[in-house]
UniProtKB/Swiss-Prot annotation:
Gene field: frr
Disordered as annotated region, ranges: 136-156
Matching PANTHER family: MITOCHONDRIAL RIBOSOME RECYCLING FACTOR PSEUDO 1, RIBOSOME RECYCLING FACTOR
Keyword hit for Cytoplasm: yes
Gene Ontology CC annotation, any one: cytoplasm
Similarity comment: family membership: Belongs to the RRF family.
GO biological process: one example: translational termination
Protein name as it appears in the record: Ribosome-recycling factor
SUPFAM superfamilies from the UniProt entry: Ribosome recycling factor, RRF (SSF55194)
Signal peptide: none
Domain of life: Bacteria
Length: 182
């Protein structure tokens, strides 16, 4: 595995962690908060995004405009049952969610959730490093690399990992700052 391939894999892992971060509330309304919500629609779990248009008319409101009005009740139920703690307001045509300001306790909970996502991201990055180092060791064993070349490759793999860990830590710090900002 070349370092470019490794970097591409690690970049994808980092992007997945960033998507997880985007599902955590900050003080502002953001339609990506609803990305993980699935709605039981005609007997199948369907992502909310494929059933409705999501918008944020102001910093404290998320508006959901279903493509099919008959799905309004199912969407409302899915949002109410989610762990986000939102109370949807259904006016018969659209659903509005007022995003209340976060309490200090909720902010701390969300910081813990962000830390958990960051740790999962680090584990994924370390697994990619392990796989890359295993391939290098196999190449050394097969005679494709000398011991010195193998060590150099392993060092370069570690440097790539270190770079991505620093980037992930920065993303975590940014997310925690956004969560704690009042």
């Amino acid at each position: 595995m070349s370092t470019k391939d490794l970097e591409a894999s690690m970049r994808k892992s980092l992007e997945a962690t960033q998507r997880n971060f985007n599902t955590i509330r900050t003080g502002r309304a953001n339609s990506s908060l609803l990305d993980r919500i699935s709605v039981e629609y005609y007997g199948a779990d369907t992502p909310l995004k494929s059933l409705a248009t999501l918008s944020t008319p102001d910093s404290q409101t998320i508006q959901i405009q279903p493509f099919d009005i008959s799905g309004l009740a199912a969407i409302e139920k899915a949002i109410a049952m989610s762990e986000l703690g939102f109370t949807p307001n259904n006016d018969g045509k659209v659903i509005r969610i007022n995003v209340p300001p976060l309490t200090e306790e909720r902010r701390k909970e969300f910081c813990k959730m962000a830390s958990k996502y960051a740790e999962e991201g680090k584990v994924a990055l370390r697994n990619l490093r392990r796989d890359a180092i295993d391939k290098v060791k196999k190449q050394e064993k097969d005679g494709d690399f000398s011991e010195d070349q193998s060590r150099d490759e392993q060092d370069s793999v570690q440097k790539v990992l270190d770079k991505f860990i620093v980037e992930l830590e920065k993303q975590l710090a940014d997310k925690e700052a956004a969560i704690l900002k009042v």
